[in-house]
Amino acid sequence: MRIILLGAPGAGKGTQSNYISKSLAIPQISTGDMLRAAVKAGTPLGLKAKEVMDGGNLVSDDIIMDIIKERLLEHDCKEGCLFDGFPRTIAQAESLDRQGIDIDHVIEIHVDDREIIDRMSGRRVHPASGRTYHIRFNPPQTAGMDDETGEPLVQRADDTEETVKKRLEIYHDQTAPLIEYYSRRAAGAGTGAFAPRYTRIEGTGSVEEIRDRILEALRG
């Protein structure tokens, strides 16, 4: 089974991706990881990607698609895979279609923007150890202080409310249209003979509750 997991930053995709991968015994396919591996290995595609990146440019969808096709030929992808961070745009989704890479199921983890802002902007971290807290969901024993050392906690720059709002804005502009694209495909309104299933999962509740909703949808 080939799966795409969609959702805004902070919706919990990373946590749920790990659960899905382990539960279904399929690998996570990360385009970023594949690019880095290809560059490190010095493959023809890796060298081509390195040349582009060294010039300060974004790697084209064509190169990414070629790397994905190579990855899907590996033995661990025989029973399927979970796409991590891809596609991000309609153009990339259409590239998958043109290359004949059929997707079986698209899962959207839906969380309201306000909830995501609260989740992410409430994070606090102890820089030295990496211990993380949340002012609402997992507060330290003493506000603003690490439980073990008593040292101050900090808010990472990418967790500020302003930054989170900007990331959500980019998501709604660039990635959210994929939700309409795949929901239309699932309803038979798109082009192409193969139509993936599409399921919207509410991303509120415990991690385990969300996991069970996703697995039930995938096995249904």
From Swiss-Prot:
Organism name: Chlorobium luteolum (strain DSM 273 / BCRC 81028 / 2530)
Localization: Cytoplasm
Assembly information from the UniProt record: Monomer.
Domain notes: Consists of three domains, a large central CORE domain and two small peripheral domains, NMPbind and LID, which undergo movements during catalysis. The LID domain closes over the site of phosphoryl transfer upon ATP binding. Assembling and dissambling the active center during each catalytic cycle provides an effective means to prevent ATP hydrolysis.
One Pfam family per UniProt: ADK_lid
Biological process annotations from GO: AMP salvage
Region span, NMP: 30-59
Similarity comment text for this entry: Belongs to the adenylate kinase family.
Keywords: ATP-binding, Cytoplasm, Kinase, Nucleotide biosynthesis, Nucleotide-binding, Transferase
Annotated GO MF terms: adenylate kinase activity; ATP binding
Protein name (Swiss-Prot/TrEMBL): Adenylate kinase
Database matches in PROSITE patterns: ADENYLATE_KINASE (PS00113)
Positions with a binding annotation for AMP: T31, R36, N57, L58, V59, G85, F86, P87, R88, Q92, R156, R167
Function field: Catalyzes the reversible transfer of the terminal phosphate group between ATP and AMP. Plays an important role in cellular energy homeostasis and in adenine nucleotide metabolism.
GO CC terms, sorted: cytoplasm
Entry-linked CDD domains: ADK
